[in-house]
Amino acid sequence: MGAGGRTDVPPANRKSEVDPLKRVPFEKPQFSLSQIKKAIPPHCFQRSVLRSFSYVVYDLTIAFCLYYVATHYFHLLPGPLSFRGMAIYWAVQGCILTGVWVIAHECGHHAFSDYQLLDDIVGLILHSALLVPYFSWKYSHRRHHSNTGSLERDEVFVPKQKSCIKWYSKYLNNPPGRVLTLAVTLTLGWPLYLALNVSGRPYDRFACHYDPYGPIYSDRERLQIYISDAGVLAVVYGLFRLAMAKGLAWVVCVYGVPLLVVNGFLVLITFLQHTHPALPHYTSSEWDWLRGALATVDRDYGILNKVFHNITDTHVAHHLFSTMPHYHAMEATKAIKPILGEYYRFDETPFVKAMWREARECIYVEPDQSTESKGVFWYNNKL
């Protein structure tokens, strides 16, 4: 069923069957990727153009209704109520547009339909509308999926080893410092990553998602980076014309603040998917693709799980089979949990509490001195 009447099967036993802070096994698993795939009903890998588009229409319809109410009725309310109404609009519209962002992300994984060209067209339009360079991020994100959990080759939120921690980190390792760090990360983290590769893997020269000739991309990808840049510039020009016609404040209130919410949730979701005290990271001496893909965690965002198309609570399955559409990921997660066993981690900690805990506990990674596996690194916070 489409977006208007979902019949997804929830994962069995939503409460964690094991302590979510218990370390995930780091030894090579006894199961293979093909065994995991065989446990999933075949229809979960089928992509439907109509069903996928139903979610696009559903999200955009809600977004338009919110915009219409905010721009046509809120100004009629008394001052304090008008401001409260706009605050609600910013939060709700930001959440809905995060769902749109997730659909565009699926297009980049070829999980929207069986037609790569259609996926790229839809993804380019939706991501450009949110000022995301579609192909640029598609290619760097693909490398993230190919190297998840690798300390040398993963693309984003690569944890630092203790020897690489900045001198000022100890001064931020306190409640006020964490508030400041989280505020900057959630508001500026996404644009800084795209423009300056902040929190990304190190390259031998300056890396930028807008640079077709940057080290992130190969020669055959450069033309599509130009297309991504053109898409973002077209939207920026459209926003400029809107600002000239309606005023800058109107554009900021209607579009800019919800976009900040989108960017904040994007960073938070990614951070919490790959940052957890129970998750290992690996150097090249230990890393392999399957263990890296399993070094992620499913989270519980309450009702926002559905708003975000379950990218939050089916992320393990997504890393194993990224071309699977989101509307089958819940059923697939239920199917693979018995096979994954302790390699599967679901943490039901409320996401705000989890954000604070991870910011406090996960400052750097280091090998566990009690084991002989020196290529396996775990989070620590002792500065």
UniProtKB/Swiss-Prot annotation:
> Which top EC class is given?
oxidoreductase
The answer to whether UniProt assigns keyword Membrane to this entry is: yes
Q: Which GO terms describe its molecular function?
A: omega-6 fatty acid desaturase activity; oxidoreductase activity, acting on paired donors, with oxidation of a pair of donors resulting in the reduction of molecular oxygen to two molecules of water
Transmembrane residues, as ranges? 61-81, 85-105, 117-137, 179-199, 225-245, 249-269
Q: Name one GO biological process term.
A: unsaturated fatty acid biosynthetic process
Question: What InterPro entries would the database entry show?
Answer: FA_desaturase_dom (IPR005804), FAS_N (IPR021863), Fatty_acid_desaturase (IPR012171)
Name of the featured protein: Omega-6 fatty acid desaturase, endoplasmic reticulum isozyme 2
Which species is the source of this protein? Answer: Glycine max (Soybean)
